[in-house]
Amino acid sequence: ELRQKLSPWRKKQGTLEARMEQLQQQLATVEQNLADPGLYDDQQKVRLKGLLAEQAELKRELEGIEAEWLEVSETVESLEAELAG
């Protein structure tokens, strides 16, 4: 019974980990674009604002996913401890 309870939690944990990795890659790409000195020219203001907004949104989403992952991981650890003990 505990194994059956554990399975969906592990699946959820894996899904969240995959999403975190995806968001981290997207964030790295945005930050790499923000490192381009040419982006700070007056002609690039619209693009700069867009990238800054995207960066903020990615960070917000990543923070939420990480918090959810921590909760799920605690549940997984708790169920695994019950199963072992």
Segments (PLM) and residue ranges:
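Charged, heptad-repeat coiled-coil alpha-helices that serve as long linker/dimerization "arms"
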Residues: E1-G85
